[in-house]
Amino acid sequence: ITKDDFVLEIGPGIGTMTQYLAEAAREVAAVEIDKTLLPILDDTLKDWDNVTVINNDILKVDIRQLALEKNQGLPIKVVATKYIYVSPA
């Protein structure tokens, strides 16, 4: 991940890895389904102005549209932790 990259993080949890991504990337969109984690994420990421937290199910996010808006439609980097739970469609 470089300063030129737009990164989509699936399931940031409390934002620990998100901080490292924000340091390395141009911009990070972190999609978190659990709204109870939003206050923690807001606090953890308050010093990072290149992070957008999206409270949604990743299966409901239009990733193509996000890439178009945030990265001119160019390929994006996707990061997720191995313990992520993706709800069935």
Predicted regions mapped to residue ranges:
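Catalytic cores of RNA-modifying enzymes
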Residues: 1-89
